Regions:
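Positively charged n-region of N-terminal signal peptides that target proteins for export
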Residues: 1-5
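Bacterial N-terminal signal peptides
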Residues: 7-15
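Sec/Tat signal peptide C-region and signal peptidase I cleavage site
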Residues: 15-21
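A short, compositionally biased
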Residues: 21-23, 76, 98-100
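Central antiparallel beta-sheet cores of small beta-barrel/beta-sandwich binding domains
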Residues: 24-93
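Short, exposed beta-strand-loop hairpins at the edges of beta-sheets
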Residues: 92-114
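Short, solvent-exposed mixed-charge patches
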Residues: 122-123
Length: 123
């Protein structure tokens, strides 16, 4: 009988974690209009792939995974890896969700130097 409260609490935790991760899932547009990215579940994390770029000379970027292994920190943020297709380098990545806005960061030197990109939800 004491097992039921534990199972109920665990079920709520799993549901809440899944719902929280789903909040960032969807299509996002860079505020500067340069690209769109789709955030979707991949395994036990979130990943983001480029779905559109404004620059007609860069169609090869479409389909590239630019965020991966983004695991929820439980507070509307995710930590993982970010890939910059412009320089081909991988960075420590972070996503911060605030309603219909998303900020992504790529950092080096343990987070001392970061570059941020602002996104808005488009679906």
């Amino acid at each position: 009988m004491k097992l039921w409260p534990s199972l109920a609490a665990l079920s709520l935790l799993v549901i809440a974690t899944g719902a929280h991760a789903a909040d960032a899932v969807g299509e996002w547009a860079r505020v500067d209009g340069k690209a769109h990215v789709r955030i979707a579940p991949c395994g036990d994390a979130l990943c983001g792939s480029i779905t559109w770029v404004r620059d007609p000379k860069a169609p090869g970027k479409v389909g590239q995974k630019v965020f991966y292994d983004m695991k929820s920190n439980g507070d509307g943020t995710w930590s993982g890896k970010a890939f910059n297709p412009d320089d081909g380098d991988e960075y420590t990545g972070k996503m911060i969700l605030d309603g219909s806005s998303l900020v992504t960061k790529g950092c080096v030197l343990g987070g001392l130097i970061c570059k941020s990109v602002d996104w808005t939800r488009i679906n």
